[in-house]
Amino acid sequence: MRKNSSHENQSSENIIEFPYVDFEELNVHSNIFSELEHAKPSTQQQQQQQNISNETTSTGPRICISRDEFKAVNLLTKEEINVRVTPKKEEFSRGLDFISDLYDQTARKSGAVRVIPPDNWKCPLTINTTTFKFLTRKNNPSSMSLVSNYPLDAISSQQKFHGNDKTLEKNSAKATINKSNSTAETSSTATVEPYDSNDLYRIFDRPDAVVLSYIFVLGKAVDLLQIKQWLQLSKQKNLLEFEFWSQAAQHYKLDVNSLRNAYNLYAETGVTTRTGNDGGSPINRPAKRVKRQNHIPKCKLCAQEGSSLVTCCICQSNYHYACVEAPFAPFSDIHYWTCNSCIPSSLKILWKEVDYHCISSFLQSSNELASSLKKQLPSFLAQTPLTLPSNTKTPPASARQSSRRTRSTSGKGFETKISINLDSDIKLLNTLSPLETFFWCCSFPSTASTSSPFSYYPESLPTPLLGRAVNTTAFPTSRQNAYYNDPWNLYFIHFSKLSPLRFTPPGILTSTISLGQPLTCQGWQRDSMSLFGMHYHHYGAQRIWYVIPEVDGPKYEKLLNDLSPSFIQEKPETLIKSKILLPISMLISNGIQVLTFVQNSNEFVITSPNTYYTVLDTGFSLSESVPFATKEWIQDMHAENSFNMYKNLHISAPFSLDHILLANATLDKTVHSAYWLMTCLKDRVDRELTLRNEFRKRHPLLTWIPTPLESSVMACAFCKTFAYLASIEEKNGTKTACLSHKDECFPNTDSDLTVLVRYDDNALLAAYSKVVERAHKADTWLENYKEALGSDNSRPSLKVLKTLLNEAETICCPLQEVSLVRNLVKTAQQWLDKFAIIFKKKSMVKKEKRKPKRGSATHSHLESPSEEVEDLNSSNINEADLLINLVEEAEQFTFDFPEMAVAFEKAESLKIFREKANAMKERSLSYEECLAIVEEGESLQLKTPELLYFKQYMEKTEWIDSFNQISQKTDSTMEELVELIERGEKIGLTSDNENMATALLLKEKSENWMKQVEGLLSQETLSTSKLFQLKSEANSICINRGLLEQLNEVLQKSENFHTQLVSLISRARDPDYYSRPTIEEAKTVLAESENLTNKPEEYTVAQKLLTQTYEWVRRGKRLFGKANAPLEIFNQHLEFVEQRNTNAMVDEGSDAPFHVGNEYYVIAGSDPSDFHYCFCRQPEAGMMIECELCHEWYHAKCMKMSKKKLRADEKFICPICDYRVEVPRHSHRPPLIELQKMVDDIPTLPFQPIEIELLKRVVKQAEEFKNKMQSEVCDPTQLSEKDVPLLQFYLRKLEGSEILFTEELNVFRQKLHEFMPVAPQPPPFIGESRSNRKPRPTKRQREIMEQVESGKLTSAEGAAAIAATQTRNQNNFISKPFNVHTLSTTLSPWAMKSLAQAAISPNPMPSAHDLLPTSNPAELFTNISPEIKELSVDSTSTLGGLNSSHLVSDQNASVICLCRQPFAISDGTVQCHNCLEWFHYECVGLSSDIVSTLSNYACPDCCSKEGKLYPWNTRPRSTPSVWLSQAYSPSVLQGTTENVAFLNKAFSASANLFDVLPVSNTPSHFSKMDYVLEDRKPDLFTETYLSM
C-alpha cells in the first residue's frame, strides 16, 4: 500500500474498512496460470513422454492427455467423456428439474457435469470488497496427505513403539525421516519416537473444525483474529501504534489499555484452555432449540446462579459469559454454541493458526505466489527429467503388476496392500500439464524404496492460502435484483418448489465461498449426507477438477481405510468428514477411475451423491458451493443410506429424514412430489408401525403422550440421531432415546419413562393416504382425458379441453397427455387470434376466475399472442385468403367451437362476392354501379383484392372532382391543397398525371409565397410596397388563412404609422428651422411606432434623426460635467447657470470695485441687503468670513467651511488673493467659445430641443458681460497697483460665473499676482474649470455600507472592502496615459487653513531649495513639522511607497516581501515567526485556508537558514503598475480605530508635503517622488467612513 507523506494523512486512514477491489477492471488474465496453455502438456513433456513410452513399453508411443474444452479425460482408461452441457434458455430455466435429467443422462455415470449457462446469463458479483472478510489457512498439499508426511514405514514403527497403548502422549515429537543421497538406490529409515496424535488428526483437515478466537474484555466479546488482521493492515499503512489501538478500541467501545493488554496476553503467551475430551462427539446442530431446564440454571465453573448464561448445545452445561474458557468459539448463534469441552481436540483450531483476509490482501498474496512459481516452474521442468534412473532396470510388466508392499503393525495388527508403481507414476505425470506435474511431483514424493526423481514442496516457494467464508454468498440477495428469483441462485436453491429439503430448518445447508491461489487444492471430499453439490465459479483463473465416479467410491474408501492407522480406523466418523489428498498415481495404480476437466468462470459443476472430487486452482479464483437435493436423492436411497450410516456409527446428523418425508407429505400439495414420495413414505411408515407394535409388546406399561409438531426435537443418547416421530424421555431427566435403543439408554426400569409421539399411527396412515390421493389425481385426470378424447369419432369442445388443462396445472400433473392437451389449446388459441383479426373483434380468450400460478407455461401461452398473430396485426394482409386458410385448418381439428361455424358461413359469402366482382371488372362501370359493389364487399367485413380495386376506382373519380373545385375557387387554402395531394398519392396518382402535376406546381408557388411572407414578417423593418405586392398575389394561389390575416393586420398598422413617419421626416428637412417639429413630437411618434412588431423602413430614419438631436444635448451635458446624468438635466442645469450668471454679472455701479466690506455701506449709509458680497455676488446671509488681505466678505457656505472647524483667531485668505485656494464647485464650467459653437450648430438639428432659447440667453448674457469687461479694461498692460481693487472685483465675478472666461481670468490672475504676490510662484495658466465636489458612493460602496449596518460585515472589513474598490478604480485610472500635474493641482479646503496661517505668520516660510528631495525620502519629513517627523523612519511601512525599491535604490532600505512590492488593503498577508517579516499569500505559496491551519509560520529564508525544506512553492508576483500611495503596512489592515487614525494621519502628511514642492528645475529622479506625493488620498466619503 502507498505510504503516507504526513502525519495528518496517516490519522485519516481507516483500518476498519478494507481497500476496494474492482473485479471489472482486474485483469485476471495477466496471471501466469490464467492462460489455457498452462493447462496443456508442454512440447518438452510430450517429447519426454514419447521417449519414456518407447523405452518402457512396446505398445507404441502414448499420446498426452488433451485438455479438450468440451470433454473430460479418464486418467485410468485414457477415455474422453463429454461432461459439458450447454442448455438452451428454456431448459436452463427449469432449474432442479433440468438437473434431475442431467443426473439420469450423464452425472450418474461420470460423477460430475459441467453446465454452461446461456450467453445472456451473467449473474453479478455482489460481494462488498471493503467489508468482506474470510478465514484463511495455509494449504500445503503435503500436510493433507497420509503418504507424504507420515509414510507407512514410519506409521508402522510408531505402532510398534507404542504397542497396544491407546492413549498417546501429546507432547511427544514427530517421526523424522532420513534420506540418503545415493543415486543408485534410496532407502528410507525412520527414527522411532513418540508422536502427537492431535497433530496426526490435523492432516484430515476436517471441514467442521472450529476456530477458537474470541475472548471477553470487560464483558464484551473481542475477536483476536480481527485484531491480528487490523494490526497487519495498519503496518502496511504505516499507521502509528497508538492510532491503531485507538481505532480498534473505538470499534469495540472499550478503553485502549484494556484491549491492548488483553491482546498482548494471548499473543505473547498463547494462553488457551484445553480439555481432554479427545474422543468426544463432533459438533452437531440440533434441528431446533433444546428444551428449557426446569431447575434454576447455574454456571458450571463458578457454580453461581445468574440471568446472563449461555448453554452448550451438546452437553447442556451453563456458563457465565465471563467464565467461558478463552479463547472460545464465536457466538454466531446463541442456540448452537459449543463449549470448549465438547469440541474434540482434532477439531480445535487456535486463532494463531489461521488468519482473516480481505480480497485485496488475498489477491496480493496470490500474485506474489504466482510470480515465484513463474520463476521456479521452468527450472523445475528442465532440471527434473521425468525418467527412471539410468542404473535402475525396468521390471517386466507382469512383475510390475504383481508388485505389492505389505506392512504389518502391532497393536491392531492390520495389513495394508497398496500398489506403488514408480513406472506408472512417471508415465502419468508426463501426460499432465506443467502446473499439474509440478503440483503432484512436489507435493507427494514417492515412498518406495526405489530411487525417486521427486522432491518435497520447495521451501523457497510461498505456501498457498485457502480462504473460506461459511454461510455467505456472492449471489444477489436483494429483491430488486433480476437474479434474486433465478433458479440457479445458490443461496435460495433450497427453497425451490422441487427441492425435498425446502422444509429443513434454516441455517443447516448453507452456501460457502472459497477463494483459491495457485496450487490450492482442498483434498478428496464428498458430502457426508450424500447430497448433490453445486459449484459455481464466480471469478478468476481456471480450476482443474479431478472426480472419482460414484461406482469407484467404495474402492477409494477401502484404500483410504487401508492407509489409515488403527486408531483412526476405530473412529470412522473422522474419515467421513475429512479431506485427505491422495496422489492420483496411487489411485490409478489401485484401479480407481479419475476424471479430469477444466472449469472456467461463469460455469457450474454439478457433483453427484457419493462422488469424491478435488479441485486444483491455477490462479486467483472465487467460487461458491452449496449442497442440495433432488427427488433422486430420496428415490435412489441415497438419503436413507446416509442416515443409516450416521445411525450405525453413532454420529449426529444435521437434520431428520423423517421430518423431511413428513413435511413433504403434509405441506406439499403437488402431484409431482407425490409420485416420488409415495413409495419412500410407504416403506418408512411400514417400518415405523412395525417398530411401534413390537415396542408395545415389549413395554406395554409405557404411556404414549402426543406432542405438538412445533415442539423441540431431541437426539437419541445412544445412536445420536433425531427421534422425530417418537421419543422416550425420563420425567426428571434430560436423556432422550429412540424406540430402537430404549434398552441401551434406560436398561433398568420403565416406571419413569414416557413416550412422546409427534405422529400417532393414524396420523402416519393419514399422511400416506394424502400422498396416495394426490398421486391418484393423475389417474382421475387421465380418465377424464380418455372420456373426452379417447374415441376416434368424439369431437370435444374447446371449453372441455381448457377445463382439463386447468386441472392439470392445478395438480402439477407430470403426464405426457398434459402436453398434448396444452398443444391443442395453444393451436386453438392461435386460430382464434387470427379469427379475431379478421372480424375486428377482441380476443375470445376468457380470463381465468382464479389467479394463474406463477411461472405457468400454459397461461403464458394463452394470454400472450403468438409471433404469427403479431405479424398479422402489423401488416396489411389478404383477409380473404386468411379466411380460406382458417377454414382449411378448422376442418382438420379434432375438437369443435362456435367460431368454426361462423368462419364456414363467411367463406361461402366470400365465394359469391368474388365471382360477381370478377365479372364486373371486364366492362366500364358508372359511379353508381361501382358504389353498389363496394357496399356489398364492405358488408363482408373482409379485406379482399377485388374490394380494394373498386375502392381505388371510386377514389380517383372523387379526387378529380375535388381538384376541379379547388382550382376554380379564389379562397382555397393550403391545407385543402395538401390534403388533396396526399389523397392522390394514396390512391396511386403520380406526377405524370396532368391534374397531379398542376396541383404540385400550385403547391410550390404557395409555399414560396408563404416563405416570403414569413421572412418579411420576421424582420424588424418592413417595406410597405412589398406588403401590398404580396397581398395582391394571394388571390391566385392557395394560402394559409392565418398567415394572410396576419399580413393584413400588419399592413393596416404599418400604413397608418407610415404616413406619420413620412410627414415627420419631411418636416425635419424644412429650411426654416422654427418650422421643424420639436423633439417631444418626434418622441411621441416613435413611441407609438415602438409597439409595432414589424416597423416601416421610415422608422429607422426617424430614429437616426432623433439620435442626432440627442447627441447635441449630450454634448451640452458633457460640457457641464453631467455626462452620466439623464438628458433632462441639461435644461435644468442651464436654468441654474442662467441664475448664477445673472447674479455674478449684475451691474453694481462704476464705484463698486473701490468699496470693500463694512466701509461701503457705512459711508453710503445704505441698507446692507442692497449690496453684494463673495464671488456669488449675493447679499449677506448666514456666517460670513473676511479675507485678511482684500477685506472682502465671503459666505462660509460658498467656501464649504463649517463653524465648528473655525477658530476665533483663525486667519482667512480668499481664493482671489491666493490662487492656490480652490473655489468649491459642483459642476464643470465650460469655456464660452464651446457654448457659442453649440449655438452655431442649432440650425443643423432636425428637431427643436427645448434648451435652445435658454442656451441662447445664457450665451448672449455672457457675451455682453465680456464686452463690458473689455470696454472697462481696454489694455491689461496699462494696469497698475491702483487697479488692484478692479482686478479683484472682476475676478470675483469671473469665479462666481458658471461660464469660464479663459483669457480674462488668466490675465487678471497674473496681473494681481504681479501687483500683490501671495504665493511664491505666479499662477499657472488654466484652460478648464472642473468640479471638485466629493464623489458620491458607488453602487458597490452602498452595498458594503448596507452589509455593515445589517451586521454581515464588521466595520474593519467594510473599510478594507471600500479601500479595495478605490484601489481598483485608481489602478484603472493609472492604466490610462496622463501627465502628473503636481504643481498645477489645487488644494483642498482642509489644507488651505494651515497655509493661510503660514502666510500671515511673522516666521518666514521655508524656501523651495530647502524642500528639494534628498537621498533618503524619509528626510523630507524633517523640514515640515515634528508631528510629521514621527512618520519618517518608524512608520515607513505606513507610506509603503517611500521605502520601496521601485522609488529609491537604497541598499540599506528594508525589503518588502519576495516580490519587492508594498502591501495593499485587499492583499492577504502572513508574518514569519522568526524574522517577523510580512509576505503576500500568493508570493510564498499560501492561501487563506492554509494559513488558518498554521500555528507557526517560517518564511523560505528562515527555512533555508535552519536547513529545512520549505513545504510550498514560492510564486513571487510580477511588478504591476500599482498606486503606491495606497500601500500600507499589514498592521493597518487589521481595521482597528488606532490604525485607521494612523492611516488618515499619513495621508495628511503626504498632502502637506505636496503643497510646498518647488515649481520647476527639479531633478529627473524627483518625478517618481512627485508622483508619490501627489494628492491621491481617499475621497472624503471614504475618509468619513473610515473615521466611523
Curated annotation (Swiss-Prot):
Residues 82-124 form the JmjN domain. Its main location: nucleus. Keywords: Metal-binding, Nucleus, Repeat, Zinc, Zinc-finger. The keyword Membrane does not apply. Residues 38-60, 385-412, 848-872, 1319-1341 are annotated as: Disordered. SMART domains: JmjC (SM00558), JmjN (SM00545), PHD (SM00249). One of its GO terms (molecular function) is zinc ion binding. It is found in: Nucleus. InterPro entries: JmjC_dom, JmjN, Lys_sp_deMease-like_dom, Zinc_finger_PHD-type_CS, Znf_C5HC2, Znf_FYVE_PHD, Znf_PHD, Znf_PHD-finger. The keyword Transmembrane helix does not apply. Residues 51-60, 385-395 have a biased composition (Polar residues). A zinc finger (PHD-type) spans 298-345, 1171-1220, 1454-1505. It holds the Pfam family JmjC. One of its GO terms (biological process) is heterochromatin organization. Residues 475-645 form the JmjC domain. GO terms for cellular component: chromatin; histone deacetylase complex; nucleus; Swr1 complex. Has a role in regulating chromatin structure via global deacetylation of histone H3. This function is associated with the activity of a histone deacetylase. This is Multicopy suppressor of chk1 protein 1. It comes from Schizosaccharomyces pombe (strain 972 / ATCC 24843).
